[in-house]
Every structure is written in C-alpha cells, then in structure tokens.
Amino acid sequence: MNEQQLESIKRKNEWLHDLVEVEFPTKESLEGREIYNRMLEQKTYEVSSNTLLLDNESNLSVEDIFLVDFHRLTVMFSILQAQRWADKHEQEMIVEFLTQIILTPEFELYVGFKEGEPVGAAIVSQYEGNTLISDLVVSQNLDKRQFVCDLGKKLNHDQKLSETIVIEN
C-alpha cells in the first residue's frame, strides 16, 4: 500500500477514536472504543481497482443501499456492526460507542437492505484518489465480498467511487 492508502485508513480510525473525545463521555462508549480498537489490530487491507468491483453480478441494487443520514439508520448501522463480536456485553458496548457517530461527509456510513431487513453495513471514505471501504459487516443472508461489489456499484452510481479501492478485511 502507498502512503495515501495508509493515511486513508489512519484518518478513518482517528475519526472513530475521536467520537468519544468529549467533555463527559460515558464509560460504556469508552469501553466500546477500547473493544473496537482491539479488533482493529487484527484487520488486514487489500487494494483493488474499481473495475474488479463493478464487473460482478449484483445481489443488492443501488436502491437497496442507503447512505446513513439520520439517527435511526445510525442505530441500525451500529447494531449490525455489533454482530462482529460474539460476546453480548461487547456488542452492547460497541452499540454505545458507534451510536455516538456524528455524520460527516468525509466518512459516510452505508446500510444495505434486502426485503426490508438490514443485511450489510460499511464505512466509506475518500482520500487522494482512493476509496476506503471499511468496517464491513453482513448478515448470514449475504456474502461479504458480494456486499463490497454492490456497495461499489452504489458509489459508482453516485459518482463517489475512485479508481483505487482499499478494502478492509
């Protein structure tokens, strides 16, 4: 990975870290941040071109994937994200941490739906010609790689997909 790609990952992680850097953070949100940061140590990343994402068949249409732009979707995003942890207490702390997210154009949250049920979520950010797709989570009804491709098509449709994609595994 090049410097810009590494920086895009660092920026996203710093943004999430700073969510609870407030005057009176809850102990639950601080614990959730610690749990989240431990998970980050296990993450790997791959670099791909946008054509590899766009050439696959779609499972979800661009109309099935929504940019999170209000609190209820933020809560759905957080609940989906919490499924990445097996422990119930850790799930609760992750929800507490992630529901602190303040929506910003630099770091966009997406939630995918199938038959009215939330089935996938991710964070997307852009930095110097790179699109970072991170914090991927899918329900048992959807393949993670498929969701990345479907999200890529949504981003391309909205003219938000760079040539180079960094995908968090």
Model-identified regions with their sequence ranges:
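Acyl-donor-binding surface of acyltransferase catalytic domains
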Residues: M1-V62, I165-N169
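Acyl-donor binding region in acyl/amide transferases
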Residues: N2-S8, Q81-T99, T104, G129-N169
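Generic structural signal for short, flexible, solvent-exposed coil/loop and linker residues
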Residues: Q4-Q5, N13, T74, T99-I101, ...
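Short amphipathic alpha-helix that is part of the acyltransferase structural core
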Residues: Q42, N50-F97
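Short N-terminal helix-initiation segments at or just after the protein's N-terminus
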Residues: T51-L60, V111-K114, G129, I133
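Conserved beta-hairpin
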Residues: E106-G120
